[in-house]
Regions:
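Conserved MFS/SLC helix-loop-helix module at the cytosolic interface between two early adjacent transmembrane helices
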Residues: 4-43
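Helix-breaking motifs and short loop linkers at transmembrane-helix boundaries and internal kinks
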Residues: 17, 38-44, 55, 72, ...
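Cytoplasmic helix-loop-helix junction between adjacent transmembrane helices
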Residues: 48-87
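Glycine-rich segments within core transmembrane alpha-helices of 12-TM secondary carriers
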Residues: 77-106, 144, 233-241, 325-337
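Juxtamembrane intracellular "pre-TM" segments in multi-pass secondary transporters
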Residues: 158-193, 217
């Protein structure tokens, strides 16, 4: 659902108000996340998770389209990198606070609510029966509604092609086939999609088995793996995402293909560093090599969006990003963890 719902939402975003679309999707995403905490069984949890996926799918394509209209071409690399950095900073918070919240008992949360003076609101709840993972879903989900309101009231919908040079404004695509026809004739776009999918394949595979590797080889528990390694790695990914966009922006006036070569060099450096991290016995070396590799690895993130927007007209930007996310989701998230798990079982 996350992969394929991006298509119709992106086409809608290329034709209508993107700020309102993002607002609705954030509300859906947040409310469905909170509802996961009150799911009564597998079916209801599955349905709420589908709602989360649909909400998530509707955010990135229109957000990228907005950024493309707000920033001129030579500034988009850093702007898109800053946007992408938010994903990594979210991962930092998830590693730092997700585990501790999920480990809370219902009575612990009740005591915290009373401590801040709002326990009376939930006086009818039997906190002895509430599991920590349910609390985590609700705490993470509900604040998103406030974020949606901030988006609605602080971001203005710019005209299409607002930051593009005169004469580049394209006609509005009347259906998905028109947008896809434009993409079909852009080989650069498809090479970028293929490259981004392969990088995501490796990245999702590594991230999925990060904690198990630290547990098996170094004896860490889940909390220590998340707080002492997962959070720093996510922070280094955020730094790499930002630096990649910043360097690309500075080099592009002197080196037209910097948007491709900067992430390529980052990935080349990351590969041997990952190998050193996986085989190091010293946890300090693991932290250094893995963190540095992660920083270099994620220098590509802003570049994929920059290329995706740069090769299409402003009327197809959201659609282009939706196609990119389909490929990245199916190849990266769909196959990467499975492949690493298969290799793990095969060699063990």
């Amino acid at each position: 659902f996350y992969a394929f719902m991006g298509l119709p939402i992106a086409l809608l975003a290329d034709r209508s108000n993107r700020v309102k679309i993002i607002t609705v999707c954030i509300v859906l995403w947040s409310v469905m996340t909170a509802l996961c905490g009150v799911a009564a069984g597998f079916v209801t949890l599955l349905l709420f998770r589908v709602g989360v996926a649909v909400g998530e799918a509707g955010c990135t394509p229109p957000a990228n389209s907005l950024i493309g209209d707000y920033f001129i071409a030579k500034k988009r690399a850093s702007a898109l990198s800053i946007y992408s950095t938010g994903v990594m900073l979210g991962a930092v918070l998830a590693n730092l606070f997700g585990g501790p919240i999920a480990q809370m008992q219902g009575t612990d949360f009740d005591a915290w609510l009373k401590g801040v003076g709002i326990g009376w609101i939930f006086s009818q709840v039997d906190w002895n029966l509430v599991e920590g993972w349910r609390i985590a879903f609700v705490i993470v989900g509900l604040p998103g509604v406030l974020v949606a309101l901030m988006v609605l009231f602080t971001i203005k919908e710019p005209p299409r092609g607002y930051s593009d040079p005169p004469g580049l404004v394209a006609d509005m695509p009347v259906h998905w086939g028109v947008a896809f026809s434009e993409l079909r004739n852009k080989p650069t776009f498809w090479w970028m999609v293929a490259g981004a999918s392969m990088v995501a394949f490796v990245g999702y595979g590594i991230n999925s088995f990060q904690a198990p590797l630290l547990q098996r080889l170094h004896g860490l528990n889940v909390r220590d793996a998340a707080v002492n390694f997962g959070a720093p790695f996510a922070f280094m990914a955020a730094i790499g995402t930002f630096i990649g966009g910043y360097i690309t922006e500075k080099l592009t006036p002197h080196w037209r293909t910097a948007v491709a070569w900067v992430p390529a060099l980052g990935l080349l450096i990351a590969a041997p560093l990952y190998i050193f991290a996986f085989y190091s016995k010293d946890l300090n070396l693991v932290l250094f090599f893995w963190g540095t590799a992660t920083m270099c690895h994620f220098s590509y993130l802003g570049a994929q969006y920059t290329i995706g927007q740069g090769v299409v007209t402003n009327r197809s930007r959201a659609a282009a990003i939706a196609v990119l996310l389909i490929a990245v989701s199916l190849v990266g998230n769909g196959l990467g963890p499975y492949f690493v798990g298969f290799l793990s079982d095969f060699f063990m």
